[in-house]
Amino acid sequence: MRFITAGESHGPELTAIIEGLPAGLPLSSEEINRELARRQGGYGRGGRMKIEKDQVRITSGIRHGKTLGSPVTLIVENKDWKNWTSVMSVEPVPEKQKKIRRVSKPRPGHADLVGGMKYQHDDLRNVLERSSARETTMRVAIGAVAKKLLAELDIQVAGHVAVLGGIEATIPENLTIREIQERSEQSAVRVLDPSVEEKMKELIDQTKKNGDTIGGVVEVLVGGVPAGLGSYVQWDRKLDAKIAQAVVSINAFKGAEFGIGFEMAQRPGSQVMDEIVWDESTGYTRTSNNLGGFEGGMTNGMPIIVRGVMKPIPTLYKPLQSVNIDTKEPYKASVERSDSTAVPAASVVCEAVVATEVAKAMLEKFDSDSFEQMKEAVKRYRLYTQNF
């Protein structure tokens, strides 16, 4: 499975094309829209969420509620487009109109300046329109398709906020994937620890008053994954590496870790490695999951646990020092409509990109023209690994 996305933040629409789905996978617009709505929720979101109520339009690859095996095209219209038709016009406009909403003061921490240098743009809007986190709309739409495929194969995905600003949530032990899903959905900040929810909301409110932004850490878990996805034989076939790339590709994400992550550096090996046991009813399992479900770049049958760190959003209502690219004089950076934090929403995006990589790995290992054939292949493989 592969995909491509297109579209600008204030253009007419966002588009995604997914290729490589088997025929016969049940899929509806409603399932995708449900995930899009989750992305637009979360405490701390800005004014655009009141403007955009994202709805997907499927224009190819699905008939009567099932995939056809041909490319699937997803389109999400930008409701705010009517206010940007001249600024974002595809056709040439008079020089005077080009200056409307032109951006010449790059924002520190954003793609503005380097993107302008790279592509020789004298209007940095040409950079920020595509580098905007609005693109994650389509990553979530694609992730919704991936989640549907995984759910049909008894693989569940859940995400939550682990850290917001300087506030760290206590994560209850032994929760099922479904329990994590339910608890995070009940929280305005998608946290599993009710004792810190109000503190997080207060921090978000104060940060907004200060004209500042805050980042955090999100965690995604994937349960029911069979052992053996990915491979150790080449560096670029390791699934944990692919997931790490996907996580860091999310706007404003700067790092990823698996299991107990960087804490491994502070422990001896005897307190890191997950001991192997076997049971007739379940087959091979581990007594712990410090490695986050991976050994040698392959899934080992334990739940995948991955964390991503999101930096504070670089668009500040009290902008930092910058330089006008026309005059080279010091100026305060440009201000665009933005959020004080998007960490709760980012947990949904992180779920989506992780689900997409796991779905791609499943399709690679159990390559089938029809989804029914794929389900049978997965069933046989699970039985094989249990009795290995």
Swiss-Prot record:
Residue positions binding FMN: R130, S131, S132, N251, A252, G296, K311, P312, I313, P314, T315, R337
Coiled-coil regions listed: none
GO biological-process terms attached to the record: amino acid biosynthetic process; aromatic amino acid family biosynthetic process; chorismate biosynthetic process
Residues that bind NADP(+): R39, R45
Pathway, per record: Metabolic intermediate biosynthesis; chorismate biosynthesis; chorismate from D-erythrose 4-phosphate and phosphoenolpyruvate: step 7/7
Details of cofactor binding: Reduced FMN (FMNH(2)).
Domain of life according to the entry: Bacteria
GO cellular component: cytosol
Functional summary from the UniProt entry: This reaction introduces a second double bond into the aromatic ring system.
Binding partners and assembly: Homotetramer.
Record protein name field: Chorismate synthase
Organism (species): Enterococcus faecalis (strain ATCC 700802 / V583)
